[in-house]
Amino acid sequence: MEAALATARLGFKTALLTSNLDRVAWAPCNPAIGGPAKGIIVREIDALGGEMAKVTDETMINVRMLNTSKGASVRALRAQIDKVSYSQKMKRILEETQNLYLRHSQVCDILVEKGKVKSVVDTLGIEYKSRAIILTAGTFLNGKIFIGHATFEAGRLGDFPSKGLTESLEKYGIRFQRFKTGTPARILGKSIDFSKMIRQDTSKEPLCFSYFDKPVILSKDYPCWLTYTNEKTHEIIRKNLRFSPLYGDVKLIVGKGPRYCPSIEDKVVKFPSKNMHQIFVEPEGKTTGEYYLNGLSTSLPYEVQLEMIRTIPGLENAHITRPAYAIEYDYADPTQLYHTLESKIVEGLFLAGQINGTSGYEEAAGQGLIAGINAALKLRGENQFTLDRSEAYIGVMIDDIVTKGVDEPYRILTSRAEFRLLLRHDNAHLRLSKKGYQIGLIPKWFYEEILTLESRIKTEIERLKQVSIKPTGQINDFLTSINTHPLRQPTTLFQILKRPDITYEQLRSLDPSPMDSPEVIEQIELTAKYEDYIEKMLEETKVFNDLEKITIPEAIDYGKIPNLSVVAREKLEKIRLRNVLQVSRVPGITPADILALITYLKSFK
């Protein structure tokens, strides 16, 4: 989706081949966009010229800002979407985009000539020639669904799997392994007793993902609901573990599942002392009565699913419309990719999304956008585009998977980012719009609007640093009245704003010329509160930038580097990274290895 839009909007004739045109941009698991770190990726996609944020704003039915009681670095939006409307609007955008052509087609082979992509071939034998191919296979590569001991091949429930592609790429040297993920059952709304659950309404504050849209307050017609499992639920699960493809006597699933989205079986087995687990009951859209049971992913048999669901308060008479299931699929080793998401093995082949071992719509969309941008830049003969870890969560994610690899489905987390205070929800457009404009995906008027915003923020901060106030009785009485300590010596408004308990709004009584722009005020408040921490982080990024500037020649022979450990030699020969900063993040690489490499590179030059 994002990949195809990027290449087409950058002027290249693009064919989007998909096995089901009615499920373009479909949400096969939770009907939601965003969440911790994920919501920030959606904002970053928007700042770079992608579409996800805009369509989320158009189709969201319940939205909340998460972690509002915590620091600014972990705040993020999460929205329930109308999944049918989301898919339809995305499909319509694709249909209306110049240079972009949709085709209902199932690709089964990729042809390579002299180490470069030549074409793809579908199941009808039709060959599509191309100088750049972006593969976004999701869970479709040799996908297999498990519901108890019942198994069948599928890309997701209701869709055929992709057969032949894995084998096609393996013969060129691309390595594949298996992962597993799962999704909970869907329940008919009229069979749910919501009076036994805790209601969670949409935000009372106006919110939106895209900078192009105006924040809105949604109607309260589509709340989410909170309920809990109990000992009866857990006893049914324990009693039936022998029927689980994960825990049965015959383990049918070999692929590793996601750590941060475990099945209910995993929770019960791994946390036996916990007597309840929360379940969020989420609406799937405006035109359906189906609800998603967030937190109740399982691969147990249908009969067991129904029995355990009916032990949960509010779900005693639940009617399952679609069973929960686990799905196992192939993914490619992401260490065989450059940071541009182009394959190191096959020139012109780009991989994005779950095929790279990641999980989640947002992670996939972010990768798709980067892959699409780089495919277009490659065809233009221009420098490739990458984001580093201090610029975006997208950069953190890509750097993680291509340097460290994955041994479980990768999910973006705020804890993965060393510079998360720089990578906030509120400043995504200030961070990245210039890049989006330079690439050609952000319009000039929008970029100029961002420049104006930056100028206003800078001017106002400078003004606040110059406006001095004295410790008069009147001023100290006011400060005491708003529960902050009085002044002992003259200070600036900016210094007062640095206090954690003071807002810009409260300073109006002391300020001769306050401003009214909420956008500017938000940035000023955050700058004041976190100025010292931000300055420290910016200093740390300089150290990282110095390591990044030490590039590694493609022809380097790691076997010739004195004092480089055997472990480092083996890993670096396999991954073939481009600079010392990337090398420093590889698990098992020691400071001594880094020093040996830097010393050798100096003599090499």
UniProtKB/Swiss-Prot annotation:
Keywords: Cytoplasm, FAD, Flavoprotein, NAD, tRNA processing. It is found in: Cytoplasm. Gene3D superfamilies: FAD/NAD(P)-binding domain, GidA associated domain, C-terminal subdomain, tRNA uridine 5-carboxymethylaminomethyl modification enzyme MnmG/GidA. Its cofactor is FAD. Signal peptide: none annotated. The keyword Flavoprotein applies. Transmembrane segments: none annotated. InterPro entries: FAD/NAD-bd_sf, GIDA_C_N, MnmG, MnmG-rel, MnmG-rel_CS, MnmG_C, MnmG_C_subdom, MnmG_C_subdom_sf. GO terms for cellular component: cytosol. GO terms for molecular function: flavin adenine dinucleotide binding. It comes from the Bacteria. GO terms for biological process: tRNA methylation; tRNA wobble uridine modification. Homodimer. Heterotetramer of two MnmE and two MnmG subunits. Belongs to the MnmG family. NAD-binding protein involved in the addition of a carboxymethylaminomethyl (cmnm) group at the wobble position (U34) of certain tRNAs, forming tRNA-cmnm(5)s(2)U34. PANTHER family: GLUCOSE INHIBITED DIVISION PROTEIN A (PTHR11806), PROTEIN MTO1 HOMOLOG, MITOCHONDRIAL (PTHR11806:SF0). This is tRNA uridine 5-carboxymethylaminomethyl modification enzyme MnmG. It comes from Pseudothermotoga lettingae (strain ATCC BAA-301 / DSM 14385 / NBRC 107922 / TMO).
